[in-house]
């Protein structure tokens, strides 16, 4: 991965945690409006020069949670065979660590925010039973596509993956874990992941 791509990807990752709805998941008919509102709120936080870095991170994390299905994200990232090969307690621990890692990773990159804007494009059917919200990050260094993939559970829609300029966040983790699990046990791989 080139340095230019890495730098741009870091800026794009800032937006990942900005699209969650506080306290409830989304109804299909509300996805575009709610996502736009949440993005606007977080961008205001990122522009607030009176906040320290830690306050900014805390504010953004406060906005985040219930629209992402972090448990499903962890399960997909680990892979079906590896997930089914560990007991329920380890599944729960892995999900919690995975969620914390994602939140920390992206909140640590908030300082890279540089007046980018996000444009909501379309909400389209995706993989038959799913939806994809297409958005565009508009910045001084160029525009980048960010697509949010939703699935339905009990009449509400949750994010289970995000495609950044054509690269799936969850599939990237999955490839990383699969590579490690070829050489290590789950416990060894998990210990390494926790210590990263």
Show the residue positions of the predicted features:
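Bacterial N-terminal signal peptides
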Residues: 11-20
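Boundary at the C-terminal end of the N-terminal hydrophobic targeting segment
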Residues: 23-27
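Early exported N-terminus immediately downstream of N-terminal targeting peptides
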Residues: 28-109
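A mature extracytoplasmic/lumenal domain signature
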Residues: 98, 124, 137-139, 150-152, ...
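Surface-exposed, charged secondary-structure patches
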Residues: 104-144, 196
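Short beta-strand edge/turn micro-motifs at domain boundaries
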Residues: 145-171
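Low-complexity, intrinsically disordered terminal/linker segments enriched in charged
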Residues: 161-196
